[in-house]
Amino acid sequence: MQTVANYPVYEATKECAKCKGKCCQHMPGHYAPSDFKDLSFEGLKAEIEKGNIAIDWWEEQPKGYYLRARHLGEEIVHGSWGGVCVNLAPWGCRLSWEERPLGCKSLKPHENSRGECKGSYSKETCKNEWKEYSEVLLKLVEHFGAKKTPFEETMGKMVEALEWLSR
């Protein structure tokens, strides 16, 4: 069995292709700090600005922030109750195996009787691993707030211009 950061990981199987990413249609994977080369404010800010990462939080005690893949159409800072992963494409995940969050790599396909995937890297464990970087995450929350990525801002301005032109 392969491991990443001491957690068992499972590459996508034919079973994943059959179900067309049901897990990805409901809950994007969470990133471990080990998924990033640069954990500084600027390094993580640059990754988040690409538009595929959200800052989420764990509500139970002790509380804490962590990073995960964004849902389609959601803000950068967003408490998740589920949604479609931005990385889900008709053929499966558009990220290479190396680019995927540990929360995705740790999913064992069809682990239980309901055919659901089960992960070896929980959100609670993820949140605990991000604790060391809580100051950086808090600065990112303050920076992004309800902001959109530069791409989303540009697209919004283009839509506004098209609406104005169509009047």
Regions flagged by a language model, labelled:
Residues 1-167:
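Short loop/turn segments that flank or connect secondary-structure elements
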